């Protein structure tokens, strides 16, 4: 066998002999192809090694290989059952409706017949030094709740991922949240509207807090499943008994299975609870008069809190308290959150497509959440705050959500619809939602002003818009490098929470200034269309290339760290050079050298995860 030496124009044999044979253009072309193939093979092997190491080190979970933390069937089912109670009936549905009802009755009483009628101005209540409309007060309370969350999570958010306090923080949020929901039992007088605002703000904070710390248990729960543990052990063996790609596929399938079952059980449980509430409303004669209806709304919110606590108890007693990540040296629970933010911001600039999606997510998530609040205030007015009608609308919405989320997931799975195309369809449905509200600014004939529109809205929102909560997070996974989910998801989580108070505050000001409850759609439609423009240059193929380059740079930094270099870069989850990371790094060097890497979910997207999150 001989190797051509292009520069000298001669052929060199294995024995070192040379000949005067000149290389033809065809020979040069063949040589270039061979060199390219060899380089490509090396790149694939290197990328696969980095990928394997990233998969094993991404959790940085010291409990990953301890037998006592294997996820049992009983523990898994207690996790499912918790979600039945934490569905938001009290803090997310009936609490806001009762707040708006009490505000409306109090404002009408204060106006004494001079407002709220045909041709009259909107009734207002004085709060925080200004006379404000009812819709403005609801949005303001919503914004205050989210603003407090941002401040709170900047200081305690790290407890969800570090140390062993996460389960106890979840218990605290759940107990306080359920208690403040049940406090609605005693708030039935319009004169208590200020107390109602306080309860609503507390409901908002505790519900979102509980949801965050409950969700933080999910990765460890999945990694503890016997199937995932077995696959991880095979990948870490020397030589590896499986490929990194196969391990990623198994973990993804188990993650999707847990989420799907969780959502299905939650939806079925919520429908049963709503059916029970419907019976209670009939028994207490909710439709008899305004006083009975007001009491009924408080009963509904209180039942939501009671079921939340009841269904949380199994998880409190059966959860295996898996320790979280270790704090980096020199950091505590207060300062590590800023480290997370700094590292995530540092890395995001190297991932242009990820940054593009982050800006899009910032705009649309806040806009959609605010729009839902605005539409809910309009729905309450159209339904005349009838607890019975609102409960029936909610049943329709939950059924539609179940059909919509699972329907889109199966369409993707069986027809090979890509994540990006499915995502674009959901965005189109969101735009229609905003346009319909925008029309309502100028006419009372339609645009969320009639009761029939809200039956259609529940079908549309549940079936076509709610998949946003699943597919938007699937998209985050599409633009996140393997092994760095922790940092990137923490950044998206912080952005989601920090942006969530902007929309309510702006919309509250618009509604209060104009006296038109539909006026916020000026702002909401503009933000929606502006965010859609960012989807035009979004390219998932470019994102995969950026991720591969990012992982290659990460490998180089890990090697420098192993040799005693700087420790706070791309290496590890937070740059710690502990024995576990070194062990994983050595494992990754031998893992899966035979198959080229593909990005999970890039082959038609069987990894889309249906999941609903109320924000």
Map each language-model feature to its residues.
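Intracellular loop-helix junctions on the cytosolic face of multi-pass helical membrane proteins
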Residues: 2-75, 185, 195, 209-361, ...
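Short amphipathic helix-loop junctions that connect adjacent transmembrane helices
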Residues: 93-135, 373-391
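Transmembrane alpha-helix termini and helix-breaking/packing motifs in multi-pass membrane transporters
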Residues: 99-101, 157-158, 270-294, 409-414, ...
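C-terminal ends and interior cores of transmembrane alpha-helices
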Residues: 171-191, 428-447
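Intracellular helix-loop hinge segments at the cytoplasmic ends of transmembrane helices
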Residues: 213-221, 377, 470-479
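A late C-terminal transmembrane helix in Major Facilitator Superfamily
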Residues: 483-513
């Amino acid at each position: 066998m001989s190797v051509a030496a292009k520069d000298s124009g001669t052929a060199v044999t294995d024995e070192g002999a040379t000949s005067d044979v000149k290389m033809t253009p065809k020979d040069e072309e063949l040589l270039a192809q061979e060199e390219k193939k060899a380089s490509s093979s090396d790149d694939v092997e290197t990328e696969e090694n980095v990928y394997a190491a990233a998969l094993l080190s991404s959790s940085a979970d010291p409990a990953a290989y301890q037998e006592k933390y294997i996820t049992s069937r009983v523990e898994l089912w207690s996790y499912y059952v918790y979600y039945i109670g934490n569905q938001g009936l009290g803090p997310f549905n009936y609490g806001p409706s009762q707040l708006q009802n009490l505000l409306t009755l109090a404002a009408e009483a204060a106006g004494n017949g001079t407002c709220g009628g045909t041709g009259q101005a909107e009734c207002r209540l004085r709060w925080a030094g200004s006379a404000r409309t009812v819709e403005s007060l609801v949005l303001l309370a919503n914004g205050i709740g989210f603003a407090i969350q941002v401040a709170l999570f900047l200081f305690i958010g790290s407890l969800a991922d570090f140390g062993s306090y996460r389960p106890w923080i979840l218990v605290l949020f759940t107990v306080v949240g359920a208690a403040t929901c049940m406090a609605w039992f005693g708030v039935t007088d319009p004169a208590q509207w200020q107390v109602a605002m306080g309860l609503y703000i507390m409901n908002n904070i505790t519900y979102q807090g509980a949801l965050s710390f409950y969700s933080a248990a999910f990765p460890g729960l999945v990694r503890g499943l016997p199937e995932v543990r077995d696959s991880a052990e095979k990948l870490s063996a020397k030589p590896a008994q499986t490929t990194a790609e196969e391990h990623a596929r198994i973990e993804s399938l188990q993650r999707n299975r847990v989420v799907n079952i969780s959502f299905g059980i939650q939806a079925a449980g919520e429908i049963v609870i709503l059916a029970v509430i419907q019976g209670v409303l009939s028994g207490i004669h909710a439709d008899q008069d305004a006083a009975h209806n007001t009491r009924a709304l408080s009963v509904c919110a209180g039942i939501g809190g009671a079921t939340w606590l009841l269904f949380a108890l199994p998880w409190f007693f059966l959860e295996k308290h898996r320790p979280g990540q270790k704090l980096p040296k020199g950091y505590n629970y207060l300062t590590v959150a800023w480290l997370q933010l700094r590292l995530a911001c540092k890395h995001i600039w190297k991932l242009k497509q990820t940054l593009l999606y982050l800006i899009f997510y910032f705009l649309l998530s806040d806009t959609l959440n605010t729009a839902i609040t605005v539409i809910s205030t309009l729905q309450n007015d159209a339904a005349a705050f009838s607890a019975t009608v609102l409960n029936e609308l909610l049943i329709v919405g939950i059924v539609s959500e179940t059909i919509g989320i699972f329907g889109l997931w199966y369409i993707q799975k069986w027809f090979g619809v890509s994540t990006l195309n499915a995502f674009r369809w959901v965005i189109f449905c969101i735009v229609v939602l905003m346009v319909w509200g925008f029309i309502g600014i100028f006419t009372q004939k339609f645009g969320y002003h009639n009761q029939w529109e809200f039956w259609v809205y529940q079908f549309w929102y549940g079936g076509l818009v709610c998949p946003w909560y699943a597919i938007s997070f699937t998209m985050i996974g599409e633009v996140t490098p393997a092994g760095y989910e922790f940092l990137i998801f923490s950044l998206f989580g912080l952005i989601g929470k920090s942006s969530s108070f902007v929309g309510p505050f702006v919309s509250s000001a618009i509604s209060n200034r104009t006296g038109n409850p539909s006026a916020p759609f000026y702002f909401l439609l503009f933000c929606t269309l502006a965010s859609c423009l960012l989807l035009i240059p979004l390219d998932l193929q470019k994102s995969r290339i950026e991720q591969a380059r990012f992982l290659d740079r990460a490998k180089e930094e890990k090697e420098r760290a192993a040799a005693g270099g700087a420790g706070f870069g791309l290496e590890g989850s937070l740059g710690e050079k502990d024995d576990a990371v070194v062990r994983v790094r050595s494992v990754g060097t031998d893992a899966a050298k035979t198959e080229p890497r593909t990005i999970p979910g890039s082959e038609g997207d069987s990894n889309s995860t249906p999941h609903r999150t109320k924000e």
